Amino acid sequence: LVPRAIEVRGVKVKVEQIDIPVSYAAAFEGERVRREDMHVQFGGKYSRAFELVKTAEGEITDGQVQLVGPDIDSVKAGEAMDLGVVVEVSGRKMQSDFEGILERQIHRYLNHAMGVMHTGQRHQVWTRISKATFAAGFRLRHFGTILHAKFHEDYGQIVDKVQVTIYTRPADIEKLLPQALARYDARDARMSGMTDESVNTFYSCTICQSYAPNHCCVITPERLG
């Protein structure tokens, strides 16, 4: 009843504190986890891994995080596991064009957790969790906790519900990875057909100002920056 009332009235969820057993801050972005300090890793050249954000096709439960398969306490330190992170989102203003934008934020959100190293996106990700972070009690479900909180915090205007399912069984990855690749290809095909003349909005990016203070990129369909 309460979730339905929140949805009908348009009440926005805000998570005041992310419930994970390690510190969480932007200061940890770019932290490297070396092999000798690593408990487990996913993707890269060591295993299969992918991340996918998609608009929910049916009813979802906000805040639900489900792990399908073994957790990271089932492997010995230094081993690799398959990983699939599927984030389903819904909202009155949510559009399929936003999926790729939200998906790219997974890199930043996971990197802000102490002892978590994340690079890449889509099916070209590489993630490591340190021994210290594992010893503190960090588990795969905490990936979902982070994503739920941050999507609501940063994209609350378009996202009403966030549900995360994490897969680690090789059989599930074998089945789901081709589906994810098909979605990536569909997005790329849609983008490749766009031209500067076909849109009425261009965007600017100032991320480079961290090392080039006078720099600003103008982003268009034919000029990506």
Name each region found by the language model:
Residues 1-225:
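Cysteine-centered metal-binding/redox modules
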